[in-house]
Amino acid sequence: MSKIAVVYWTGTGNTEEMANAVAQGAEAAGAEAKAVLVSDFSADEVGDCDAVAFGCPAMGAEELEPDEFEPVWEACKGVLGQKPVALFGSYGWGGGEWMDSWKEDAEAAGLKVVDVLIANEAPDEEAVEACGALGRQLAEA
């Protein structure tokens, strides 16, 4: 059974809802998965995981949350190696450019990004289903 951490930061609860759906999808595919706030996760825990999903909403000028999420993300990039990674998050304006930049950053670091997913504002039923599919995809990667 693979072990997957779904690490997220949320400001309004939208990304938390997405994280829970990703974890449920991974569990449905037979993985052991847990959604965990970024403040409760460290790069030291990456070694215990077979795959990791990271969730962060767009902040400010289409960027990652700088105080809690980004430092953990930066630390994890150096230890993920070729473990499958998924990226997800919500946004309220713009077109989701932060996700394009985030994916480029991950790939430039040599990470194996299996997929990305964005939702505008609160995830609707379609977005929640897509999050579940993302979790299943990560579990099967």
List where the protein language model places each region.
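Helix-turn-helix
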Residues: 41
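Aromatic-flanked redox-active Cys/Sec active sites in thiol-based oxidoreductases
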Residues: 8-12
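FMN-binding flavodoxin-like domain, especially the glycine-rich phosphate-binding loop
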Residues: 3-4, 14-17, 21-38, 48-141
